[in-house]
Amino acid sequence: MKTYLVTLRFHWGYSIRNYFASKVTDTYIVPPLNTVIGALAMANCARNGIHIENVLGASNAKNFASHIKYAAFMLKYRPIKFTSLLRYSTSIYWLTAYDVQRGTKLSELFNAMQFGFNSYLNGIMNMLLVTDLEKADLYSITRLGSKESIVSVLDVKEITGKNITKVNKGSIIKNVTFSFNKDLVESVIGNFFIETIPSYNEAFYNFFMQPMNIATEPIYVPNPIVSLITSKDACLFSTDVGNAIGPSDLW
């Protein structure tokens, strides 16, 4: 596995919601690992001429789960989250919905209300990624979230050598700018916000049977920088844009 710093630029913002009822769920500011795996699977498949998102009984994203071990994120500023946004047809002709049994017109809107939208105009997101995929796959990322969440990859740098170290429980780490799991820290000093996101779940890639129990995990997101004390042994990554911590087995 190698560690990369991937710099992404969003064109206008992004929406990262829960499949399958994605239009009526809130958006996440920090992408869950399942979203990252899906984005990289799509990038790799497109680069290799495989343009199939879903095949009955199989998922391309599921095959990439073992290739991504860890991901952490740094935001230039906190995106503005909107809880609802009306979706409407932009075609020439309005589509009208009818109740067939009653024979009555329901609405002239063809789509559901969309909940969850992060306004992040031309915003930069740095992604620290531990993976065995090629650098070309990382440069091929075009979206991170829903189909509207278009990104451009500005740069991909490999982090090596002395920039990756193991730190012991009780260590004081300064200049932390990347998101981290609450379980890794004993205390945090600085400005941050907490995002509760779904833990990795292979069942999300089964498009015909949804998971009944979804575990979540609290993620601390520095806004813009914090210092912390580790609650257990951890792995420290030093980058040009600040420090990141992760589980000790990454070292």
What name fits each language-model region?
Residues 51-66:
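Short, glycine/acidic-rich hinge or "gate" loops at secondary-structure transitions
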